[in-house]
Design a protein with these regions (language model features):
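A cross-family "folded-core" feature that marks the main globular domain of proteins
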Residues: 15-310
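Intrinsically disordered, low-complexity segments enriched in serine/proline and basic residues
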Residues: 2-3
Length: 310
């Protein structure tokens, strides 16, 4: 069990959601187990699998054992671990249905923007986060996000998704969150993209910022954050930071064992800066950075220094 935003949530459960539109016939034969509210019910499929179903009025005047009309089903939530189903049902039952709807719409929007699959846990974690953020707002307890600047710079698409969520919440609920909350939501999306824990995502973001600060200090220059080369550097640093937590390294896949030495000769300043980054990572995190990694980073640093304003 993990303490998540003041609630006990088992993040080890395998959680997934299926759009009914993509599995229409799988919804046939669902029978009500328990009505959670007018728009959410727990149900049992013909094969005995317990699910949670969302749809406008799907629980209205329904009772245990009744078959759910297919046309009322909008979403079907399935947990691969049956013992964890109660946990999700309790979460859904404890919040107004519009908050689950908002979370689901934000996730669907994120999938479209990013054009990639997200970790299924996002339905659990983001719903809980939005619900808790609203509760804090109602209690006049608003907190800033110390990583706002970094999230804006490093995760632009995810931050845009966060602002979409804030706009949706304001339109639906009349609650206007500060932009810090967009950054918090963005970090949840990043978690789901790379299947990392929130603590790791925060640390990865700080590593990227620390490396950029080191680069700025080494070259005594400001980086052009609007350039394509800067975007490529951020992407490279993001994967480098993620490898710290997966204990992975980049090995030479060029077929040229002399690649690092060649880069050192061609880009000596960038290579030395890259070695400073290597020393920082190895000293701070105990993660070994290969010479190939040093060389690839040096190439990105050269691009950043020479390709401004792309």
């Amino acid at each position: 069990m993990s303490r998540y935003l003041g609630r006990d949530i088992d993040l080890r459960l395998v959680f997934f959601i299926i759009d009914v539109e993509s599995e229409r016939y799988g919804a046939l034969g669902m029978r009500i187990d328990r009505v959670i509210n007018n728009n959410v019910v727990s149900a049992v499929e013909e094969n005995g699998t317990e699910v949670v179903v969302m749809g406008k009025g799907v629980g209205f005047q329904m009772r245990h054992g009744m078959t759910i009309p297919e046309e009322q089903i909008e979403k079907v939530f399935r947990l691969d671990n049956p013992s964890s189903m109660d946990q999700f049902k309790n979460l859904v039952a404890s919040l107004p249905p519009e908050r689950l709807q908002i979370s689901t719409e934000v996730i669907q929007y994120a999938k479209g923007v990013l054009n990639k699959k997200l970790s299924p846990n996002i339905y659990l974690t983001l719903t809980d986060h939005i619900n808790f953020a609203i509760e804090r707002f109602q209690e006049h307890m608003l907190f800033g996000n110390p990583l706002l600047r970094e999230v804006r710079a490093f995760y632009k698409e995810e931050y845009m998704i966060g602002t979409f969520a804030l706009d949706l919440i304001e339109r639906r609920l009349g609650i206007a969150f500060p932009v810090d909350e967009a950054a918090s939501i963005a970090l949840h999306i990043v978690n789901a993209e790379y299947n990392t824990k929130m603590r790791d995502t925060i640390d990865i973001t700080r590593i990227i910022q620390d490396v950029l600060d080191l680069v700025r200090e080494y070259f005594q220059m400001e980086l052009d954050e609007t350039s394509l080369s800067y975007e490529r550097l951020i992407t490279h640093l993001r994967f480098l930071a993620q490898r710290i937590y997966t204990s992975e390294t980049i090995d030479d896949d060029t077929g040229l064992s002399e690649f690092p030495g060649m880069i050192e000769q061609i880009y000596p300043e960038e290579y030395q800066c890259s070695r400073k980054v290597k020393e920082y990572i190895e000293k701070t995190y105990g993660h070994q950075v290969s010479e190939e990694e040093v060389a690839y980073l040096a190439v990105h640093l050269k691009r950043v220094r020479t390709q401004k304003g792309e």
